[in-house]
Amino acid sequence: MAITAQMVKELREKTGAGMMECKKALETSGGDFNKAIDILRQKGLATAQKKASREAKEGIITSYIHMDKIGVMLELNCETDFVARNEEFRQLAKDIAMQIAASNPQYIQREDIPQEVIEKEKEIYKSQIKGNKPPQVIEKIVEGKLEKFFEEMCLLDQPFIKEPEKKIKDLITEKVAKFGENIMVRRFVRFQVGQTQDE
């Protein structure tokens, strides 16, 4: 299948990847748009992993208020002031702040969850399993429930509210590939009217 300039343009707009990368991905996928996106995502992930070791000391603090009832403050870091001033980076920060307001994550990533919290969840899931099931089946069920728990509790594992087929970590990975810089959520805080500190 011939790869047209229009196809390359559309893929660039959708992924934010470079023109040559988009062309190569379309050629590799035989013109299949979704496969090309997957190829770019995989490459982006490789790029993100290489860049993750670099320190992100620049960035912005952004806030989002929803109906005067929910407020979020977020620090999103990058490596250079140039990227921090970029409109697309600022939009990413806004989108993540909106995500936090809507989905109320408790942690940034699963590695931040204390081990005792995970163990407690596993015990609860095991106690909910009815019948005499083999240990490996129980383990599979518990793992599945734990994945759901991570999706609920961890910002990076949550489906993006604007594009639910994409996770927040995918969204960040795409921008890492586009800007060629490490990007990370440093911290966030979420307030809700009437909510106590322990809730």
Swiss-Prot record:
InterPro entries: EF-Ts_dimer_sf, Transl_elong_EFTs/EF1B, Transl_elong_EFTs/EF1B_dimer, Transl_elong_Ts_CS, UBA-like_sf
Record localization: Cytoplasm
Region (Involved in Mg(2+) ion dislocation from EF-Tu): 80-83
Chief location of this protein within or outside the cell: cytoplasm
Pfam families the record matches: EF_TS (PF00889)
Coiled-coil regions, chain positions: none
Gene3D superfamilies, alphabetized: 1.10.286.20, DNA helicase RuvA subunit, C-terminal domain (1.10.8.10), Elongation factor Ts, dimerisation domain (3.30.479.20)
Keywords recorded for this protein, A-Z: Cytoplasm, Elongation factor, Protein biosynthesis
Cellular component, GO annotation: cytoplasm
Gene Ontology BP term (one): translational elongation
A GO molecular-function descriptor: translation elongation factor activity
Similarity annotation: Belongs to the EF-Ts family.
Function: Associates with the EF-Tu.GDP complex and induces the exchange of GDP to GTP. It remains bound to the aminoacyl-tRNA.EF-Tu.GTP complex up to the GTP hydrolysis stage on the ribosome.
Name of this chain's protein: Elongation factor Ts
Lineage: Bacteria, Pseudomonadati, Nitrospirota, Thermodesulfovibrionia, Thermodesulfovibrionales
